[in-house]
Amino acid sequence: MSLPIIKVHWLDHSRAFRLLWLLDHLNLEYEIVPYKRDANFRAPPELKKIHPLGRSPLLEVQDRETGKKKILAESGFIFQYVLQHFDHSHVLMSEDADIADQINYYLFYVEGSLQPPLMIEFILSKVKDSGMPFPISYLARKVADKISQAYSSGEVKNQFDFVEGEISKNNGYLVDGKLSGADILMSFPLQMAFERKFAAPEDYPAISKWLKTITSEESYAASKEKARALGSNF
């Protein structure tokens, strides 16, 4: 049975890079349909023609025989679908049911627990750097700092402490001491947190080493080149 036609609806400067990496690591053939952000860094309306929410990534899967299409949204669900339907050699998903459960857990953990406090910190950083006139800028920074201190910065630490512990006890990876779909999906928010100084790499040596290890994969380099060709820099 032949594999379906796979299309990635790609938005520049987005987390869709992880999907390219996943597909490349599994040696799957796919087409990239690119979209550009507007002057306000928003997704273009064309994406809403593919999915009502107009977000990226979106994965289009078309049966070669019937022509029937599926549009998949939400990164965790897309990863779960790809691993379930296309990773027949168990390259990034384990045959062991218990290990597979652990991998699937992280596919939901990323957006459900890790990403929210990081997104709050990101929004607060934008508030502080918004260029508002004094004294509004002073008050905005004070409010942003209070929110960060009361919730998001502490929750970022809580999440990073958890991930640090998981990698430390699993021989340098999230699950079972080897690369899985969970590692690929988790890479982006942890990288961005370090780059935006929401967490310090020196405080999390296991995460730092893990990032260096997984980004040395040939599939990462191949996907990075594709992203650069599309106008994104990772």
UniProtKB/Swiss-Prot annotation:
Reaction catalyzed: RX + glutathione = an S-substituted glutathione + a halide anion + H(+)
Signal peptide: none
Catalytic EC class: transferase
Any one annotated GO CC term: plasma membrane
Keyword Lipid metabolism: no
Keyword check for Membrane: yes
Membrane topology: Peripheral membrane protein
Keyword line: Endoplasmic reticulum, Membrane, Transferase
E.C. code: 2.5.1.18
Residue ranges constituting the GST C-terminal domain according to the UniProt record: 96-234
GO BP terms in the entry: glutathione metabolic process
Subcellular localization, as worded in the UniProt entry: Endoplasmic reticulum membrane
A single GO molecular function term of this UniProt record: glutathione peroxidase activity
Record-linked CDD domains: GST_C_GTT1_like (cd03189), GST_N_GTT1_like (cd03046)
Gene3D superfamilies named in the record: 1.20.1050.10, Glutaredoxin
Domain GST N-terminal: 3-90
Subunit structure: Homodimer.
Family the entry assigns: Belongs to the GST superfamily.
Name of the protein this chain belongs to: Glutathione S-transferase 1
Species of the source: Saccharomyces cerevisiae (strain ATCC 204508 / S288c) (Baker's yeast)
